[in-house]
Structure formats: structure tokens, C-alpha cells
Amino acid sequence: MSANHHQQFFQKMKELSSQYHFLATNKATIALADLSLLNDLRPKNKLPALLAQKLSTTETQKLAHFTYKKRYTEWLGGRLAAKYCFELFLGKVNKQPLAPNTFSILADEHGRPYLEKTTYRPLSLSISHSKGYAAAYVSPKQSCGIDIQQITSKMEVVAEKFTNHSEKALFHDPKNQLRNLTMIWAAKEAVKKSLLHDQSITFSATNVIEIKKTGSNTWKLQCNVIGSPLPLTTVKIATFNDFIIGCTEGESYA
């Protein structure tokens, strides 16, 4: 495909990110990318210049290790979304922009992304992807978490593993059970990434205790988090086509 096609990837990412900017609090930022616009890429082929110029040498080397197309596209799309999200963050806090190929977004020992070789700290970063979309969140707080999840019937099959009757009863529209279950899942995944990233426990440590509808397609879920320095946290939720996006943040720096 032509450079114009890949330019559409960045243009659509800009549009989607602007559309869902309300999910980010205070000085935080969010980015959302459509990975279908990268479908022409193949792991063994040379990365087009328009995309390659966004990656550092370290990231380019990391990308070369992915031989499975789906994982290749998700990793690349996630990094491109995160770098755009960081660009938005710098603009929000009135800092000079950085060339995206001058710093790396790597993963720590728990798999959580972080910025390497940049003085723009403290901040936290989270990345998620699901069925052709990637999402990123950058926050000035100690931690943050974002999750994007497609609404599918799989949620009913695994519901007992991540939720209970009390949480499901908080919703007053049982006709939307798949959506409701996906909201609970996304909320708990976002909390895990933000507050429980270094723990083996996942869903059992987070209990949804309150759900408040804030708009036609937006909600706030209040969660009790066991074993966290922030035992009570809020997850902002929005629907996006047949997807759910959930975002949360941890404590502020002292």
C-alpha cells in the first residue's frame, strides 16, 4: 500500500483520540488506533519509512523478533499509539515535543510499558489492544491502566472467573448482559495494570461496588481493590462501536 494509506492510519488515530479524549483526566491523555490500516504489513518485509521513522533503533530491533503477523501488528500499533499519546501529553503540559525515534517505549519485568531515555518524568503509561484496535494512556500519576475489549459471547462463558452476582446486579439493564460483563472485565483489567501489575492475583482482588451512568455511552465504575495503596479507585468506561474502553489512574506523586 502507498504512504498515503499509512498516513490515513495517523489521521484516523488523531480523530479517534480526539473523539475519546474525555476519558482522560486532568493532564492525562488517551490515544486510539485502527490496526486494520496496517493490514498490509508483513513481518519479513521492510517497514515503510513513514512508520519506521516513529521507532527508535531499540524498538526496530524488538519489532524484528515478531514473526507472527497479528502480534507484529499489535506491538507496532500499540507503540505508535503510545508515542502519539505521549506527544499529546507533552502538548498538554506545555513541554517541547520529542522526535519519536529518539526514545523507546519498553516493557519492565511485569510487562508494563515505560519510557526509556527521556527526562519527561514522572509519568506512567499503559497500552492495550483487542481485535484490530490499539489504545494507549499517559498519566502524570504514579500509575495508570487502560483496557480495550471487544464485546463477544465469550464473556458469558468465562463470567464466573471474573465476576459475581453482586457485581452483575449493579446494572439495571440485564438485556445488555454481554456489554455489562465486558465493562466489568475491562474495569478489572485496567485496575490490574494500574494498581496490581506486580501481583499474580487478577480479578479476585478487585470488586466493583458502584456503577454510575454518566452519559449515553459512558459510565464510572467504583472499585474496591484489595492489597493496593489506593483501595478505592474509579474506572471511566465508554463504548466504542462493539468495544468497551476502560481507564483508571493511581496515586499522585508526592
Predicted regions and their residues:
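Core catalytic alpha/beta fold that binds nucleotide/phospho-ligands
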Residues: M1-A254
